[in-house]
Amino acid sequence: MKVRASVKKICRNCKIVRRNGSVRVICVEPRHKQRQG
């Protein structure tokens, strides 16, 4: 899980999701997981 100021889609499988106030990227590739912080 990377914590970044700006989250971006890395590949075409990445999806940007808002979960209880935080913006996250979920993907089939575990290294692409990100969270805005």
UniProtKB/Swiss-Prot annotation:
Spell out the InterPro entries in the cross-references. Answer: Ribosomal_bL36, Ribosomal_bL36_sp
Indicate the segments annotated as coiled coil, or none if absent.
none
What are the annotated GO cellular component locations? cytoplasm; ribonucleoprotein complex; ribosome
Its GO biological process terms?
A: translation
- Keyword set, alphabetical order: Ribonucleoprotein, Ribosomal protein
The encoding gene: rpmJ
Q: Which family does it belong to?
A: Belongs to the bacterial ribosomal protein bL36 family.
Supply the Pfam families for this chain: Ribosomal_L36
Q: Which GO terms describe its molecular function?
A: structural constituent of ribosome
This protein is called Large ribosomal subunit protein bL36
